[in-house]
């Protein structure tokens, strides 16, 4: 290890404590009083300073007096500072104080560099003036009301004495009327100011956290208790204290005012801490006592590789998950190396293809080489992957220290170029591969495809190295069993699974002058430079984008799939009788075959105990097909069937898969309580989601994702497209083929389209959540309900729901108050879209494919327009909104036509389509399709609109896909529908 890096290890404790102090430098914002102080309805006598009063409720304040101190002198100086001073003084204005400690100045600079940008601060004087004006008006109104009370009292006294001069009383009444008119005018002005303030300031009892896409999802409450629960006596235990800080700060805000209420205190503090830690590391390495904090710069260090090369060719789910865990463990090791062992910086981004760290800007090439060598040494992936760390050439300062005078010098952290850049393929270390094979003559390991399959303790072609990892993964499952890693447990009643894939295209939000610059922080100036009134692309805000999208997929993985829980598993007690000298390996799965050829999958957990790892309903269906129907529950039927039987055991992944290893003599079968979701999550990263789900649940889950997307991203859906894909297959289809098809779907990126508005409608009535919408009906049949208010429906959203408009790109749109010229043309607010407008849309789509064979995956291929290359499937992918239409059309035909009728209609239509070589807008074929459907023997003919929808679907080819999906893939027609034949 180089001397430069050793100095970081020597100062580890000081660096990690400084990092914790940076995490806590704005801890005063995690207080209920802070929310109340910045509300429009705060009480007049309320006083709270988050930099002074933050610790008043804490039970333990000793940590504030801890000293952060360098181990050695740097240019004859020992650097030290108290945690308390960092928290209270580490602000951007510390740069203006000559005598301030450089450690405090560095934190102030890092605070500014990562800044939320406080865009509203540019109008801070105006806002304060409005607040003062409102207060003055309130006082004046009260003064006038007091004057009225006084005059009315005088009138009452005069009238009681009976000596009132009518002229005097009338004069007083006239004065009261005049004052009341003044009050009305003052109140009108005060109400107007209140309305403006409420557009920005939130209520003390109703302050919400927003996503960067304008969805307000959490009401802030109980901050004091959250802050008090942080274990401040553990500030020297980095892992525990930061975890506790994050758990508290994720419920607080860096800024409460709209529309900058999208950065949580967790997002904000984490970025400041990362910058501060790396700046101190740079100070130690460079040893510059004359360092000017204003000139601080940073770089990104990344380790990127194509993860698909690691787990994409896995032959089973346990192998896939073991490979994925192996990859992630090495990234965790890298994180520990750079964050704790040699505290150089922090991981600020991770996805399926690696990690990105923020590190100090150090020009010395020898240091950077030593750093790369250390990373290669510490995360070698045991020779299977050669890691290539990259220190980005471009340095950046974030927000320029004097940004008010020189905003052009702000530098957006160029992380998007890393994330969206080419991902290097992986390669093994040839020397290691050569050593593995010395003196070996055997098959190749089917897990790594590199090592020799030298395991003597397994019947499978696997190396000892990977046997331990794969069986170790299964052992972990056996100990918990709160989830599943077995494909057959996921399969539906028809033995089918679905790989559900999804992608949120966030690259446009991360790049310079990207979609963040389409979000105003105040009413846009139509004639002004968009850079002056749109949000800044601060590090904190960019970070918030990928954290939000990652959270979206994580919530899909947990919340949306939770309702499919299974509550029973079956355990079999049996004695294994081997054929030849075969053995069963503990923590392995095998195929069990009964005398009457009922097959299912079991897991050997040791001590003659086996667990059935297959959908119990599917096994029961197999049993019922050979015997009479029964009303018994699946687990009861299987127990009754299995007791006392002799069951042959096969290893489908073994070297002799066609020969039985032996047999099980079953002595007892019991059912166990279980609590697992039959879903195997694979990826839930910022821009990508993969999970294996039961085939018959895939559409329900897709609809739930669509609903969640429309609710949470509805204001920016034209700029943040969602891609969904469903790859259906039988449960024993090679998982590598299924994964390949899913990856192919995700490679199809959304292409910008131009949609003409048929009808723009302002919805008068709010929905059940009181939010208000603006409906856009497009000529292509798509309908969007765009949210145009913030949470609760009382505050108009003037910040998020904007659309790029085509026909007015080069000229100012007439009569559109809420419009401005953005980075790539004119943007108009959803509420001001008019009939006939042409909008630029990045559409969301969904696609599906059934792999009846592994080679079918090659048909998932797209042309330059994003459509399937295969002419038969050229209608795919469909707009995401068509998911609802698929359901509606299927309901229309399945409830009124028999299975045979549907099949016969499709045969007539598709045969004629092929024979006539039907093109686009073929009126003859349109008439033919209408006639065929009209002449069908409907049980009840659909309404005209529904019938027209079915005809249009038949002409476009959509009906063929709907029938394939529902009848051929999902087998919905097998649910006992009567079949009377005919057309």
Tell me what each language-model feature is.
Residues 1-983:
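Regulatory and interdomain segments flanking nucleotide-handling catalytic cores
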